[in-house]
């Protein structure tokens, strides 16, 4: 799997924007891709395009993550709809995690424990992360009324590091209250 750093002028940006809007509901897109592209040089982040080894010029997906001192928060990861269930997502995801080495990697995904119209999709996403080596931390966040499970790449969740990371992110935002806060629930996260 080939990962390419994407910039606002990259030829695949229009395909990325289309995938961004298709893959994530509006409630999970508090900022536009244009806003993300404008901040690429201003915050410690990575926007990576995913390309198969066999067809290195074929845009297949993307990852957007924000780097902390010793961590990475995966904000968005998606593969093209026509490539889903082909194994490319798992290969790409493992390549992305490998790209960051021994860094603690965090992702959050919609909780399947809430009533929702996309319950089946939520369960598929959850299983994807668990199948690819992530661990549920027992912690949750809420963004725009939707509950998310926080998962990490290591068995032990660095909660203090996560909170420090979120506080640093909030310091640079015009509306720091928009960032999700950690909380626990009384439900067991069954694997």
Where are these regions (language model features)?
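Short hydrophobic/aromatic beta-strand element in the GNAT-like acyltransferase core
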Residues: 45-50, 62, 148-150
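Conserved GNAT acetyl-CoA-binding A-motif
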Residues: 100-121
